[in-house]
Amino acid sequence: NLQGNEVDDYMDVIEQYAKVENKEELRKGLSRLLYRQNEKLPAAKNPAQPDLADLLVPGHVMLAEVTDWKEAVSLGARPLLEKGLIQERYLQTMIRQILIQRPYIMVADGVIIAHAAIDAGVNETCMSLVRLPHKIAIHDYLQADIILILATVDFQNHLKALSQFNERVSEPEGLARIRRAADADALRAVLIGKEG
């Protein structure tokens, strides 16, 4: 197995010059990296991309009353952390990026997508969403009341769900229904297009 041999070669070099705290995690990370570089993405090898309903499962959609954006992002990440879908460092990286890089992450009026790199502690592609009663300042450069947390294991797996989300929030009436939803279940139903 060519890729396995490459991973072993990289492991040998790294271990010569660095103290490796967790060999198994390093091996997994190198395997993912090498696989991604060698991947040609043939359709047969690509499992179907999850849609929005697959990722925004019950318990991943919340209504909250917080005024601090870091608290809102942390709240959104909580179910993902509790299920082991992301690691704590993914949450910290999202917050640090907003603080330091001030990325433009707004996709519609008052709607932001908080995310970090695929190698920043993602175990499984996942999403969660927090809706606030009114817009709050996101590090004093954006205003948002809807925060989508996105984590993806590669550059493709989240695209279908993200496209569906963008469709929902890009139309004013869809956005209004998201803001009017009375509870988390109703909000999820609006988001995934299953409202009664």
Model regions: which residues?
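Cytosolic covalent-transfer regions centered on His/Cys nucleophiles
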Residues: 1-196
